[in-house]
Amino acid sequence: PSKTRNMVRRSLKDCDIRIISNIELIEDNGYDVLDKAYIRYKDKNCNPISRSTWEEAIRNDLKSEFWGVYIKETGKLIAYSKNSIGGLRVNYASMKSIPEYMNKHYPNYGLLYEMTRYYLKERKYRYVTDGYRSITEHSGIQDFLIKRFLFRKAYCRLTIYYKWWFGIAVRLLYPF
């Protein structure tokens, strides 16, 4: 869509979007991005982990690839993504951005465009995914990807295993 193209262009003009190391993410105050991102979440019971726990997890994560979005004028980190790679796919495992910059610099548009271009065109992965829809759906990222970047839903079969006695109760109450 043309509106999406304009927002991507604006983001690429205003922002520097690149792969960064886990240490760069910590040093460039990635935790502040995480902390401020939680402000926009619909589920107010959702709170970020502590800074020390987050930094330890990021420092020890040597398997993921990290991307950062920096404002060109100031060099400030305003968004980041943590991606896990497995086989022929890339999972955009966690994307965070500071809400106050979202409607001025459109960091998510540029970030998604650059990551998708890089992984699908340059690195030749078969597909990218944003993972599974959460029960709380606190961020709305799936709807954003479907509407703006023409992602699609890929449904999967869910198999639930119960304790034997609970399974009997479920089958009696819901015979489907």
Protein language model features and the residues they cover:
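A conserved beta-strand-loop-helix scaffold within acyl/acetyltransferase catalytic domains
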Residues: 1-104, 118-119
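Short low-complexity, flexible loop/linker segments enriched in glycine and/or proline
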Residues: 35-36, 144, 168-171
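Aromatic (often tryptophan-rich) hydrophobic motifs at membrane interfaces
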Residues: 63-167
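Acidic/histidine-enriched, glycine/proline-rich intrinsically disordered or flexible terminal extensions
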Residues: 172-176
